[in-house]
UniProtKB/Swiss-Prot annotation:
Key words, A-Z: Disulfide bond, Glycoprotein, Host cell membrane, Host membrane, Host-virus interaction, Hydrogen ion transport, Inhibition of host autophagy by virus, Ion channel, Ion transport, Lipoprotein, Membrane, Palmitate, Phosphoprotein, Signal-anchor, Transmembrane, Transmembrane helix, Transport, Viral ion channel, Virion
GO cellular component: host cell plasma membrane; membrane; virion membrane
GO molecular function, one term: monoatomic ion channel activity
Protein name from the UniProt record: Matrix protein 2
Lineage of the organism: Viruses, Riboviria, Orthornavirae, Negarnaviricota, Polyploviricotina
Chain residues carrying a lipid of type S-palmitoyl cysteine: 50
Quaternary structure and partners: Homotetramer; composed of two disulfide-linked dimers held together by non-covalent interactions. May interact with matrix protein 1.
Gene name of the record: M
Pfam family, one: Flu_M2
Residues where Phosphoserine is found: 64, 93
């Protein structure tokens, strides 16, 4: 009998399920997969901001500076800072009277 066709019936004033074949390996595997899926879904919903922030910033790291002389590293930092400073000119300053 399939789990999809099981019927819940009142047994001794409690609701129960007549599952005679619950020791079937397929049923056990499906139950374990279902429980693991539920746990992972709950963790994802609770910590989705942290999880996706790690993925987002982890993949957007700058180029590796291993083996690059310090002078070139400083030049690169200055170029990056100048690019950021140039972008600040695009914002409009609004003053309220």
């Amino acid at each position: 009998m399939s789990l999809l066709t099981e019927v819940e019936t009142p047994i001794r004033n409690e609701w129960g399920c007549r599952c005679n074949d619950s020791s079937d390996p397929l049923v056990v595997a499906a139950s374990i997969i279902g429980i693991v899926h539920l746990i992972l879904w709950i963790i994802d919903r609770l910590f989705f901001k942290c999880i996706y922030r790690i993925f987002k910033h982890g993949l957007k790291r700058g180029p590796s500076t291993e083996g690059v002389p310090e002078s070139m590293r400083e030049e690169y930092r200055e170029e990056q800072q100048n690019a950021v400073d140039a972008d600040e000119g695009h914002f409009v300053s609004i003053e309220l009277e």
